């Protein structure tokens, strides 16, 4: 029996030399030495799929190892029969993966075998000697982003509380966490604050903040320079990974595949993952389903546009930081007119400061109106999906005219094919030309549910790829909406 165990230990050792750490861990960690009957050594696998994959991938290699070491008559038999069904004698002879590694250490006279094994990964690292990254730096964390200077309101309170909790106890709960919402609402501020606060409270942890674009560029560069192993090592040895604007990875299957494996490696090791996105995971298109499912494993929390009271607080805070005094009526006017996001509110205060500092004039209503107009015009010019840019009524008007559909039908419950098709297109156009959520779009299209709207959007997206006529129709409609 002891000889058979040593043979199995030998096989594991030889295979370890040829596999990556991740592959070895995936395929062999859950195997269990059961017994030997004559020249047959029985190894238990966790399920039938695992058994079939092990046999398919490693039978040839195992035979080579046995032959090379003079065990020509020995056969390794894999079974998916649960260990508990074996007799008490066989149960006592069963050897787990950890025990097999310990046995091999003893066989070699390795003194490390006397120490307790903390984890399978730790043991694997003893055989696959890879150095962890040294001199770890986090160049993209900006110290100006803190929880202390984040303005809290009903639109972002849950996201704030979750972010603070993550900083205090990374990897314990809310893992992964995805914060989503429109442009300029504070997602980056919270993500950076998580990194800064965690660094302050847990200075021994390796924390990395990166934008999705930088993550992509770094991956592409690693392929060009044949340093993908270095790239993987950098990201899979982290204690906390913070990726901003994950939606920028849409339609990029290669980097999505890499992110999927990085996600798994960190998640299985209880390392914290936090992402930001401009929409909820269910609304992401051109993203692999398995990656979207990873995002929904933990907490998904949204940040909506600030209400009037919060807008006032944001302006007051920015004015205080910039050292200017804003009269109450001016402050309220800016808060009433600039309703888009935090970024635009702060831009308004910055412009006010410029007038005061450079022109040395007193701020009045006319100047404020001019500043607000500049901000709104800029928002229209730079935000392709802004709800200010294209009026919802114009979208509907063009759609009804071009498809020859009655107003009552598009928002009604008719199931005629041409009406249903028009509703699908309406939902798709609203999603592409406005910042409305699927719930808000559903209310516009006759009280449809989130899932119904999402189905419509995805259907048109698929049809455009597969049906030239549909694609031409949508393109024509979109061009007319833009020109209108």
Swiss-Prot record:
Ligand binding (ATP): 184, 186-188
Family: Belongs to the DnaA family.
HAMAP family: DnaA_bact
A single GO cellular-component term on record: cytoplasm
Gene this protein is translated from: dnaA
Pfam families, alphabetized: Bac_DnaA, Bac_DnaA_C, DnaA_N
Region (Domain III, AAA+ region): 140-356
A GO MF label: lipid binding
Comment text on domains: Domain I is involved in oligomerization and binding regulators, domain II is flexibile and of varying length in different bacteria, domain III forms the AAA+ region, while domain IV binds dsDNA.
Name listed for the protein in its UniProt record: Chromosomal replication initiator protein DnaA
Oligomer status and interactors: Oligomerizes as a right-handed, spiral filament on DNA at oriC.
PANTHER family (UniProt xref): CHROMOSOMAL REPLICATION INITIATOR PROTEIN DNAA (PTHR30050:SF2)
PROSITE patterns: DNAA
One Gene Ontology term from the biological process aspect of the record: DNA replication initiation
């Amino acid at each position: 029996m002891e000889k058979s165990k040593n043979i199995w230990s030998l096989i594991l050792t030889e295979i370890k030399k040829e596999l990556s750490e991740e592959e070895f861990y995936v395929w062999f960690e859950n195997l269990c030495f059961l017994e030997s009957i004559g020249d047959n050594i029985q190894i238990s696998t966790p399920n039938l799929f695992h058994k079939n994959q092990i046999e398919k991938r490693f039978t040839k290699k195992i035979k080579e190892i046995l032959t090379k070491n003079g065990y020509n008559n020995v056969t390794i038999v894999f079974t998916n029969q649960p260990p508990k069904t074996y007799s008490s004698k066989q149960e006592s002879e069963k050897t787990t993966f950890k025990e097999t590694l310990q046995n091999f250490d003893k066989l070699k006279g390795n003194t490390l075998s006397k120490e307790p094994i903390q984890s399978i990964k730790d043991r694997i690292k003893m055989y696959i000697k890879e150095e962890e990254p040294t001199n770890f730096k986090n160049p993209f964390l900006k110290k100006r982003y803190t929880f202390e200077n984040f303005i809290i309101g009903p639109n972002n309170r849950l996201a704030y509380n979750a972010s603070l909790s993550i900083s205090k106890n990374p990897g314990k709960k809310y893992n992964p966490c995805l914060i989503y919402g429109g442009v300029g609402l504070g997602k980056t501020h919270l993500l950076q604050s998580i990194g800064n606060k965690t660094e302050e409270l847990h200075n021994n942890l390796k924390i990395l903040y990166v934008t999705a674009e930088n993550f992509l560029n770094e991956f592409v560069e690693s392929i060009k320079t044949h340093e993908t192993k270095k790239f993987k090592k950098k990201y899979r040895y982290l204690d906390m990974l913070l990726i901003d604007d994950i939606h920028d990875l849409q339609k990029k299957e290669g980097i999505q595949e890499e992110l999927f494996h990085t996600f798994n490696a960190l998640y299985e090791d209880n390392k914290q993952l936090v992402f930001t996105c401009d929409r909820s995971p269910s609304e992401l298109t051109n993203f692999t389903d398995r990656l979207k499912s990873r995002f929904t494993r933990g907490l998904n929390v949204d940040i909506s546009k600030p209400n009037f009271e919060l807008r006032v607080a944001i302006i007051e805070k920015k004015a205080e930081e910039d050292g200017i005094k804003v009269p109450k009526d001016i402050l309220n006017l800016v808060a009433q007119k600039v309703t888009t996001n935090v970024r635009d509110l702060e831009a308004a205060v910055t412009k006010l400061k410029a007038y005061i500092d450079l022109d040395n004039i007193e701020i009045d209503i006319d100047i404020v109106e001019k500043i607000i107009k500049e901000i709104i015009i800029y928002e229209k010019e730079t935000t392709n999906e802004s709800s200010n840019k294209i009026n919802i009524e114009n979208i509907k008007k063009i759609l009804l005219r071009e498809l020859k559909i009655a107003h009552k039908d598009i928002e009604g419950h008719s199931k005629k094919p041409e009406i249903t098709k028009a509703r699908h297109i309406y939902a798709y156009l609203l999603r592409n030309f406005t910042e409305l959520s699927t719930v808000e779009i559903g209310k516009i299209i006759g009280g449809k549910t989130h899932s119904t709207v999402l189905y419509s959007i995805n259907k048109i997206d698929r049809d455009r790829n597969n049906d030239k006529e549909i694609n031409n129709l949508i393109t024509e409609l979109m061009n007319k909406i833009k020109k209108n």
